Structures are given as C-alpha cells and as structure tokens.
Amino acid sequence: MAGRSGDSDEELLQTVRFIKFLYQSNPLPSPKGTRQARRNRRRRWRERQRQIQSISAWIISTHLGRSTEPVPLQLPPLERLNLDCSEDCGTSGTQGVGSPQVLGESPAVLDSGTKE
C-alpha cells in the first residue's frame, strides 16, 4: 500500500486474504431447530468469532509487526480548552432561520376557553 514502509504490498494483501478466509470459514448458524438448539449454535458461533478476532489480532501484530489498535489521537489538556463566543461562533448559515415572531395580540388558541 502506498506510503507504508517495512513490508511489501503483497505481504499485506496475503495477510488480509488469510484473515478474510478465517472469517468466511465461520458462517452464520442455521435458523432451524428448537429455540435451545438455535441458542447453542449462536453461542458456539460467537465463541468462534471471538477466537477468530484474537487470532487475527495476533497475526497482524506478529506477522506485520504493528498494532491492531489505531494510534491514539493526542488531545490538548482540558485546562487549555475553552469556548469563546466573543466572535461569530457557529451562527453562519443559520441567520433568519427560526426567528421569533412578535404578535400584537395573543391568538385565539391561547384564550381561556370561554365562548363569547
């Protein structure tokens, strides 16, 4: 893949194909049978999925030599964060939308409910 150093494109593609094969080797369980049988099949399927996920993480970390987790984003400390609305903050494009209407007298729907 473009911009990657340390491993070739073919090695990365081969690893991805192998992990894809692992996931395809565990199809969804059949919806047939009693409730208990379906529940047991789903439980075994979920366990196999967890095993495949851990094997895939191991393959990526050892074979390709990189972490499965993305690099964490470095955020500034909370003390430095502030909201300063002295400037035009977030109102662009919303001017005139939902502006309040001032009525001379209250409409009939707000009357006390007595008929004249």
Swiss-Prot record:
Assembly description: Homomultimer; when bound to the RRE. Multimeric assembly is essential for activity and may involve XPO1. Binds to human KPNB1, XPO1, TNPO1, RANBP5 and IPO7. Interacts with the viral Integrase. Interacts with human KHDRBS1. Interacts with human NAP1; this interaction decreases Rev multimerization and stimulates its activity. Interacts with human DEAD-box helicases DDX3 and DDX24; these interactions may serve for viral RNA export to the cytoplasm and packaging, respectively.
UniProt keyword annotations, A-Z: AIDS, Host cytoplasm, Host nucleus, Host-virus interaction, Methylation, mRNA transport, Phosphoprotein, RNA-binding, Transport
Entry's family note: Belongs to the HIV-1 REV protein family.
Main location: host cell
Paired cysteines (S-S): none
Segments of skewed composition (Basic residues): 35-47
Residues bearing PTM Phosphoserine: S5, S8, S92, S99
GO biological process: mRNA transport; viral process
One Gene Ontology term of the molecular function aspect: RNA binding
Residue segments, region Homomultimerization: 18-26
Motif segment (Nuclear export signal and binding to XPO1): 73-84
Bias (Polar residues) ranges: 89-98
InterPro entries cross-referenced by the UniProt entry: REV_protein
Listed name of the protein: Protein Rev
Disordered as annotated region, ranges: 24-49, 86-116
Function in brief: Escorts unspliced or incompletely spliced viral pre-mRNAs (late transcripts) out of the nucleus of infected cells. These pre-mRNAs carry a recognition sequence called Rev responsive element (RRE) located in the env gene, that is not present in fully spliced viral mRNAs (early transcripts). This function is essential since most viral proteins are translated from unspliced or partially spliced pre-mRNAs which cannot exit the nucleus by the pathway used by fully processed cellular mRNAs. Rev itself is translated from a fully spliced mRNA that readily exits the nucleus.
Keyword Zinc part of the UniProt annotation: no
Top-rank lineage group of the source organism: Viruses
Sequence motif Nuclear localization signal and RNA-binding (RRE), residues: 34-50
GO terms for cellular component: host cell cytoplasm; host cell nucleolus
